[in-house]
Amino acid sequence: MQDLQKIIDDAFENRASLSPAAAPAAVRDAVAEVIAGLDAGTLRVAEKKDGQWVVNQWIKKAVLISFRLRDNEVIPAGGLNFFDKVPTKFGDYTPEQFQQGGFRVVPPAVARKGSYIAKNVVLMPSYVNIGAYVDEGTMVDTWATVGSCAQIGKNVHLSGGVGIGGVLEPVQAGPVIIEDNVFVGARSEVVEGVIIEENAVLSMGVYIGQSTKIYDRETGSITYGRVPAGAVVVPGSLPSADGKYSLYCAVIVKKVDAQTRAKTGINELLRGA
């Protein structure tokens, strides 16, 4: 693995010289191995180690290099033609591969090659980008998008129209991470490497980026970039310092433990906010 990483790191430093017509075989093979690992779930852009999320920057570099090594080509899909550098994940799947994968793909859902879809995942008509990891039992509902390199945990529900942002550049930036058992309400957006910790609930229409204030009404504290475990979050606003206007924020209205979260319906948690 260290040899593979070194090839990718060195190639990224010299990426301006790479093209479909000019790239060493070792670089092509290394990039292909990384994309195949992402596709199979054996490699991940980010993984949790000792309770902390660690970003594998070299894997993001491999994804970026892959764009330089391929020309756009016609990609047929269901009677339509598309023109892109990255093939679709399921374009050459056999019935046996779908059975082995153990997930459902409802037309016209699209996942790109280099994304991982685990067992018991349901992809309603949705989109999953390269480098993304969607873990077991997760529902990606209609018109939801999972951006490049986003990490989605087990038993997550991404409701209709949810946008999970992608982060490829800058390389050092972390991806959006949605941990296990999180519910993200319809039309919500989580972008810019924000982390939603396990068992959290986001109501419909919550928008969170790195500059979004996350206000905890119990403590009065304001944080950025991370929603704590078990938090129930709704859209809200905070007054300006001069009191002349208000600006959008996300409001933590309560926190629940895993047991309460498992036993309580989403609507019940959100009522009375």
Curated annotation (Swiss-Prot):
Pathway: Amino-acid biosynthesis; L-lysine biosynthesis via DAP pathway; LL-2,6-diaminopimelate from (S)-tetrahydrodipicolinate (succinylase route): step 1/3. It is an enzyme of class 2 (transferase). Its EC number is 2.3.1.117. Substrate binds at residues 104, 141. One of its GO terms (molecular function) is nucleotidyltransferase activity. Its main location: cytoplasm. One of its GO terms (cellular component) is cytoplasm. Keywords: Acyltransferase, Amino-acid biosynthesis, Cytoplasm, Diaminopimelate biosynthesis, Lysine biosynthesis, Repeat, Transferase. It catalyses: (S)-2,3,4,5-tetrahydrodipicolinate + succinyl-CoA + H2O = (S)-2-succinylamino-6-oxoheptanedioate + CoA. It is found in: Cytoplasm. PROSITE patterns: HEXAPEP_TRANSFERASES. One of its GO terms (biological process) is lysine biosynthetic process via diaminopimelate. Disulfide bonds: none annotated. The keyword Transferase applies. HAMAP family: DapD (MF_00811). Belongs to the transferase hexapeptide repeat family. NCBIfam families: dapD, PRK11830.1. This is 2,3,4,5-tetrahydropyridine-2,6-dicarboxylate N-succinyltransferase.
